[in-house]
Amino acid sequence: MKTTLELLKHIREECDFLLSESKNLDRDEFLDSETLRRAFSRSLEIIGEASKNIPSEFKKTNSKLDWKGMAGLRDILIHQYFGVDYELVWEVVNSLIKDTKVIIDDLVNELD
């Protein structure tokens, strides 16, 4: 079983990937690229899965993040095999990941 620190580092890695790949990308380029759509979706799934496995007590004492929302997004992506809303994926990456990364960095630094 992975430690909380390892799980947070997984989340950070995926945030880094999403931020790096979306940096010089516009919405249409993202939507036109099947590879990027799949990669971004997978990264969000990994973030959600890692967040689900972080202990409840840790989440309670570190409530700056929407842990439930991260896990919920993962569930939506996992269970909608043929109908992933890539507009939603794009919006999440562009509106939430940067702030999530800042908080995750702080948590990793506290535990490391």
Regions found by a protein language model. Give the residues of each.
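Solvent-exposed interaction patches of small proteins and small membrane subunits
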Residues: 1-112
